[in-house]
Every structure is written in structure tokens, then in C-alpha cells.
């Protein structure tokens, strides 16, 4: 299935961008980059194999590229067989097949088979003007992209983010980096780790996502002076209900606040532990002070940023090693001068300077989180000061255009 509004190829050809799912609400940073690359004059062809989200952000509709979809469940075998017979005599097919056999010998999984099959299909269905394959996330998307690039004889690059880095084996990442022209990542910690694994550290580039601020209101909203004594202070969190977000820790912290302190917490986002969190809130007697809105589009989320008093995101490391890098929602909240309370974990301190542009507490520490919540709920003056300081810093140091220009330059060099 393809859109009918794909751009005409430029003289330099098009770029195949492989993403797991499009559109995906939780990955606005990917949409922001792709729309930005189009604004830099690059013509894209999107290949995707995951189930798209039903709700779209406005930025998803700005993308002009053709979107080429594969089956989101398993492998379309008739399509694979047609592709196989089309590409099996290509010079790169033997090397791709050898890589697949080595991978299956090391660890035979259905995922590896699906990745190989998808790579074969994409390689067979690539338009003639594709000059390069570029994947978002160094996990399964890069596995698929690597097979496709090998078969088609095209250069490969990828953008690594968070979970894909920290839940992949070192050997797997090392092997993929060896096959790439270059790789970008969005945090200093991630860049240092990937550089350590790469045979050529110079091919790993630290490029922050930042924000395209033209998508957000520029003027800070007027906020009230709620201090928890009368009208409830409005707390907001935006993020999937998954372990690494620390929302279970937040519920424990909220339950320890004084009973006479008035607050209301709103959570935006779906996720696999949403029912678990709702059960926890009920057990703690907090259900009547919590709203769970599920997935929302960007316009609704911006309204919530502007109508809330404090943004809370207590990130931590999950039991499987998954972690956030630098959550975009923190930058989004700060862009609306909303005071932020988070943790001194992963790359969050690259954005938030504790006590100056926000407040950071140790991860998975409900006691410290309760103390910070108590203080900030009672102090509209501190919230305003932190919100304005965060607003000034994020808009001066985390603008997206520079990073997008850098990625566009890397892509053009590889596509020559």
C-alpha cells in the first residue's frame, strides 16, 4: 500500500528509510527528523513493517514521502517467494544469505527469519532510484535494513536511540556498526558506548533530537498560584505505561503525600502495564485523584502542558536493561515553561540542571520523589522560576534544525 503523494525523485535519487511502524505516537522525534530531512531537499521512501497507531500527530501528515508497507504480523510468504526469485541472483544476495545462516546458527529465532524475509522483500521492491538504506533504531529495524542493503548493494546507516542500544548484545551492535557507513545517536552516554564498540569510533555521531519549535506555541502561558491548600495542583506525565518510566514509583510517592495536600495527576499514554498501574492506584486509594487519558495527539498534549502546573517523569532502568535516553516529552514540557521533576538518570541531566532548570531526584526513590513533590506542590513561585529557566535553556540549546542539517549532510555524502 502506498500513498499517492510521493515527491518526484531528485537527481541524487531517493533515500530508503526503514522504520518499524509508521505512524507511531511515541516517536515524534522520528517524524520530526524525516519531515526535516524533506525540508532539506532529500527525497524519502519509507519502508515499514509494524502496525501503525490509529491516532496521528499533525506532523505525521506533513511527510510527503511514499510509505511502503509490509505485513505487520509474520511473513507474507507469497510476497517473499516472489521477492526471493527476483533477488537471488543479485551480487549481494549470497553474502546476505551467509549472514542469515551465521545468525541462525548463533541463535535461531523467528525474529531473525522474519528480518531476513523482510529484507529480501524490501530489496526486491526498492524503486530504481534508491541510493541508500537508513534505519531508525539499531535493533530489528537495522537487521532488516542490513539485509536489504546487502542484497541491493547499497550503503547502510542507522540512528540508535535507547532501548535498542541497551537491550542489544555488544556483539550484535559491534557487528552492525561494522557494516554501516555511520551511525547517529541522541545521547552522550549512548554515543560513548557505541564508540567503544565500534572498530571506527569516528563513525558514531552524537546528534541530539532537539525540538522543532515551530510546532509549539512560543509564549509561556499564564499559570495560577495553586499551592495545594485549596485548588489542586495539576500534575502531568506523558509517556507509555512501561517499567522504565517509573510511574509505579510515582504512585508510591503520591500515596505518601500529606492527606490534606490537594493535587491531581493526569497520565497520557497507553502501554502494557496500564492496568497494573490502575490497580496499584486503586489499592493505594488514589483513583479519585488520577486521570488516565490514554493516547492523545500532539495538539491535545500541548494543551495539557499549558494547563498543568508540574510535569513529572521519574525515569529509571527497567529489569531488562531498557532505559530512556533524553525523553522528548521533557523538552516539550519545558518549551511551554512547565516546571519539570525527573530523575538524575541516563541523559536527563544533559537537559535539566538540578535546582536551576528543573528538579532531579535519584531513580526508583519514592521517598525523595515524595519530598520533591511536596515542596514543589506547595511553591508556585519555585515552579514558575524553574519553568521559565527551563523554557529559556531548551529553546536556546535544544533546537532541532542544526542536528537535522548534520544528518542530511551525512546522508548526502553516503548517497554520492
Say what each PLM segment does.
Residues 169-171, 195, 211-231:
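Acidic anion/phosphate-binding donor-loop and adjacent secondary structure
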Residues 295-296, 303-308:
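Short alpha-helical donor nucleotide-sugar binding micro-motif in glycosyltransferases
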Residues 306-321, 338:
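Acidic donor-binding loop of glycosyltransferase active sites
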Residues 189, 210:
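Carbohydrate-associated surface elements
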Residues 330-335, 339-342, 352:
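Short hydrophobic beta-strand element within catalytic cores of glycosyltransferases
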Residues 354-355, 359-366, 375-381:
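Conserved acidic donor-binding segment of nucleotide-sugar-dependent glycosyltransferases
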Residues 268, 275-299:
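Nucleotide-activated donor-binding/catalytic signature segment of Leloir-type glycosyltransferases, i.e.
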Residues 222-255, 266:
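Conserved donor-binding/catalytic core segment of Leloir-type glycosyltransferases
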